[in-house]
């Protein structure tokens, strides 16, 4: 870990703030009337996803850290433990959901044998990187009311991982759909 001056911190840098890894979302540099400088930072905690603001003086320093991505294959879920295999070393990485509650929202997006990236800091997984849109198979659909098309009519559908989303009335069991992983919303139907 390296120490960097506040004037050298840039957007996208990774810093250790109050013992937790953060990414710099915004950086604003301003000079004061007496020749001093102030750097205002907007930071996102990579563990709990909280956003904070910090102000550093020109002479202040911060601890830069290295975050790395491990390319992994999702193997299975055993009760509250997700098991991945590192594609470089073939080591298995277990992720206990009881200890990492912030991964709960990503569990329903994980599909066995698919490739993902684990964001790691100090040999600890701090995030699971998902693709912006993920393909799923529809396993169950809610009955739709015929003729209910005055507005953008939607119905609940259940996907192969158990995720339930709203989709247009024309979606049927067996269809493949793309889902936006950030908003958890239907994006489009995949044509065969």
UniProtKB/Swiss-Prot annotation:
The metabolic or biological pathway listed in the UniProt record of this protein is: Protein biosynthesis; polypeptide chain elongation
Name any one GO molecular function: translation elongation factor activity
* Record-annotated membrane-spanning stretches: none
Q: Which GO terms describe its biological process?
A: peptide biosynthetic process
Q: Cross-referenced SMART domains, in alphabetical order?
A: EFP (SM01185), Elong-fact-P_C (SM00841)
GO terms for cellular component: cytoplasm
Q: Which Gene3D superfamilies match?
A: 2.30.30.30, Nucleic acid-binding proteins
> In this record, what's one Pfam family?
EFP
Compartment annotation: Cytoplasm
Q: Does the keyword Cytoplasm apply?
A: yes
Its keywords, alphabetically, are: Cytoplasm, Elongation factor, Protein biosynthesis
Tell me if Protein biosynthesis is a UniProt keyword of this record. Answer: yes
**NCBIfam families found in the cross-reference section:** efp (TIGR00038), PRK00529.1 (NF001810)
The UniProt family comment states: Belongs to the elongation factor P family.
What does this protein's UniProt record list under function? Involved in peptide bond synthesis. Stimulates efficient translation and peptide-bond synthesis on native or reconstituted 70S ribosomes in vitro. Probably functions indirectly by altering the affinity of the ribosome for aminoacyl-tRNA, thus increasing their reactivity as acceptors for peptidyl transferase.
In Swiss-Prot or TrEMBL terms, this protein is called: Elongation factor P
Its lineage opens with: Bacteria, Pseudomonadati, Spirochaetota, Spirochaetia, Spirochaetales
Instruction: State the gene name recorded for this protein.
Output: efp
């Amino acid at each position: 870990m390296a120490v960097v001056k506040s004037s050298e911190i840039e957007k996208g840098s990774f810093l250790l703030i109050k013992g937790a890894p953060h990414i710099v979302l915004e950086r604003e540099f301003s000079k004061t009337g007496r020749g001093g400088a102030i750097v205002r930072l907007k930071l996102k905690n990579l563990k709990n996803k909280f956003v904070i603001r910090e102000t550093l003086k020109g002479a202040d320093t911060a601890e830069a850290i290295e975050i790395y991505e491990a390319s992994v294959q999702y193997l299975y879920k055993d009760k509250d433990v997700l098991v991945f295999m590192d594609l470089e070393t073939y080591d298995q990485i277990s992720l206990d959901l009881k200890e990492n509650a912030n991964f709960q929202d990503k569990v329903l997006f994980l599909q066995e044998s698919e490739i993902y990236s684990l964001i790691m800091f100090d040999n600890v997984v701090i995030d699971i990187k998902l693709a912006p849109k993920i393909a799923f198979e529809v396993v169950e659909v809610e009955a739709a009311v015929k003729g209910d098309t005055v507005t953008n009519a939607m119905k609940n559908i259940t996907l192969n991982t158990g995720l339930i989303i709203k989709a247009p009335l024309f979606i049927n069991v067996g269809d493949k759909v793309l889902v936006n992983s950030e908003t958890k919303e239907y994006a489009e139907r995949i044509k065969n």
